[in-house]
């Protein structure tokens, strides 16, 4: 009967662990590099800054559309017009006078990209038509699995995540709201997107 000596087991275990660590480190390094390559933007709001990483590989059309609007200063001066605690904070459509800013065009739905509506992610708002998203987006303030694509049915396209400024997101979420211009969840004191800039 052959036996494996204890020091041999130890050596093999160390080698296996080293190889595994190398694989994990390489994978983590790849993810870090990919994250560093992702475009980032800063939402300068009247309550503070929110820095966002955009998932260009998973949602290329959505990110391209969003960055185009950023470069056109489309979002400057708009408000968070829909604030629902425990759900979402939404912007991209109305100014302080509740005047609707007409979007330039729609973007195709990319909700089957594997990204989920989790707390801290950004996703596109839309109507019942899956391809009706344009400029309005929201930040999830909770995990909202019911907004994900499921069973072949399209959901709401996730295209980014907050990397800094979740305290500002929470402050917006907890703002006192009212009904205004036929909409619920409008902050009593306007919370303005003063600028959106690339980082």
What are these model-predicted stretches?
Residues 15-21:
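Hydrophobic helical h-region of N-terminal Sec-dependent signal peptides
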């Amino acid at each position: 009967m052959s036996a494996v000596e204890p020091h041999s087991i130890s050596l093999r275990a160390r080698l296996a662990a080293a190889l595994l660590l190398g694989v994990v480190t390489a994978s983590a390094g790849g993810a870090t590099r990919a994250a560093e390559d992702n475009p980032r933007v800063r939402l300068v709001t009247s309550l503070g800054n929110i820095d966002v990483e955009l998932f260009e590989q998973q949602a290329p059309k959505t990110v391209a559309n969003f960055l185009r609007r950023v470069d056109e200063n489309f979002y400057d001066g708009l408000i968070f017009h829909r604030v629902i605690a425990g759900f979402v904070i939404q912007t991209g459509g109305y100014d302080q006078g509740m005047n609707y800013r007409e979007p330039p065009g729609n973007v195709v739905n990319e909700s089957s990209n594997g990204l989920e509506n989790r707390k801290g992610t950004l996703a596109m708002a839309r109507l019942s038509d899956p391809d009706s998203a344009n400029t309005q987006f929201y930040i999830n303030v909770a995990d909202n699995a019911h907004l994900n694509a499921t069973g072949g049915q399209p959901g709401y396209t996730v295209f980014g995540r907050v990397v800094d400024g979740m305290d500002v997101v929470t402050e917006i979420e907890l703002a006192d709201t009212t009904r205004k211009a036929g909409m619920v969840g409008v902050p009593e004191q306007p919370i303005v997107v003063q600028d959106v800039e690339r980082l």
